[in-house]
Amino acid sequence: MPRICPILDKRPTRGRKIIRKGKAKKKGGIGLHTTGNTPRLFLPNLRNKKVYVPELAKKVSLRISARALKTLMKKGTYTILKEKGLI
């Protein structure tokens, strides 16, 4: 199952985790130094939700991001799902 939100097309993005060592100058140290730079994936916040669609009079099971859930509630479930071709 792909880690993609079907409504907003959010997908995993690549980034890096930067590891720092030392004491900050503001706290009396000589400054932070970067000691590592590890590649990683930032995953979308996907949730399994059952959303009620009044026009169809039934619940639809979706795997959507938390941001997409807010969009559904704001613009209406039927219009968004119809626009994206999910129903």
UniProtKB/Swiss-Prot annotation:
One of its GO terms (biological process) is translation. Gene3D superfamilies: Ribosomal protein L28/L24 (2.30.170.40). InterPro entries: Ribosomal_bL28, Ribosomal_bL28/bL31-like_sf, Ribosomal_bL28_bact-type, Ribosomal_bL28_sf. It comes from the Bacteria. The keyword Membrane does not apply. One of its GO terms (cellular component) is ribosome. The keyword Ribosomal protein applies. HAMAP family: Ribosomal_bL28. This is Large ribosomal subunit protein bL28. It comes from Methylacidiphilum infernorum (isolate V4) (Methylokorus infernorum (strain V4)).
